[in-house]
């Protein structure tokens, strides 16, 4: 074979094996809109009150790990001040948030119908596979749906990546992954408490501004799921 190319083999049914044609992946997460978040990191020095708030919020986050596990994990990562990205636990979101699973299912229905329509119009004689990736779509968790994810992420984006295989008899199967992304930042307004300890967005914003806690990116993808 020619140097620099990927060899292709064929199986018993003459389908190509090896590396196929590239398809687009999910697009880069667009990030925050202007005005979100706490502004520049470490824009001022930390004073004693900041350190006292940091200590109290760390105690509060540790105390809420059983009731609000993902909210506590995300807050502790913020207070850890590394600024590194953190996995978003997309599988947990799909399991806990019917609205998210509903949006992903809607993506699947839309593109499955398109694949079935195209396959029928193409008069195919064998199975054919269609890949697709959606745009990032904005979502919002309501406290009434799940308080853990309300405090863990609030607003976020999702995208769905899928392959749909249509067979000659009109049946089909699909494999998909849900992708989620968010910027863990504080916009003000939220406040929650565990026992005597209350944690507010405004306090957390000041910790980022003073350089002893840091906003970061949340990114995640689900396991590959199959259907229907």
For every predicted segment, state its role.
Residues 1-106, 110-131, 135, 167-168, ...:
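Low-complexity, glycine/serine/proline-rich disordered segments
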Residues 130-147:
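Negatively charged, low-complexity tracts enriched in Asp/Glu with abundant Ser/Thr
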Residues 144, 201-203:
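Sparse, context-dependent recognition of short Cys/His-centered cofactor- or disulfide-binding micro-motifs
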């Amino acid at each position: 074979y020619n140097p620099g190319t990927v060899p292709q083999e064929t199986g018993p049914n003459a389908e190509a094996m090896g590396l196929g044609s590239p398809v687009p992946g999910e697009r880069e997460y667009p990030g925050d809109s202007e005005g979100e978040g706490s502004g520049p990191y470490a824009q001022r020095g930390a004073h004693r009150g900041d350190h006292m708030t940091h200590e109290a919020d760390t105690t509060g986050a540790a105390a809420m790990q059983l009731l609000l596990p993902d909210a506590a994990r995300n807050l502790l990562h913020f207070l850890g001040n590394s600024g590194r990205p953190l996995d978003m636990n997309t599988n947990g979101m799909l399991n806990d948030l019917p609205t998210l699973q509903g949006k992903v299912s809607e993506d699947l229905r839309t593109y499955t119908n398109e694949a079935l329509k195209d396959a029928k119009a193409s008069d195919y004689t064998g199975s054919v596979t269609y890949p697709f990736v959606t745009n990032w779509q904005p979502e919002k968790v309501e406290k009434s749906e799940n308080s853990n994810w309300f405090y863990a992420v609030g607003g976020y984006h999702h995208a769905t990546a899928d392959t749909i295989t249509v067979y000659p008899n009109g049946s089909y199967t699909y494999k998909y992954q849900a992708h989620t992304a968010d910027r863990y930042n504080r916009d003000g307004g939220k406040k929650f408490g565990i026992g005597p300890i209350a944690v507010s967005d405004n306090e957390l914003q000041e910790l980022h501004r003073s350089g002893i806690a840091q906003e970061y990116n949340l990114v995640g993808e689900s396991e590959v799921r199959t259907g229907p």
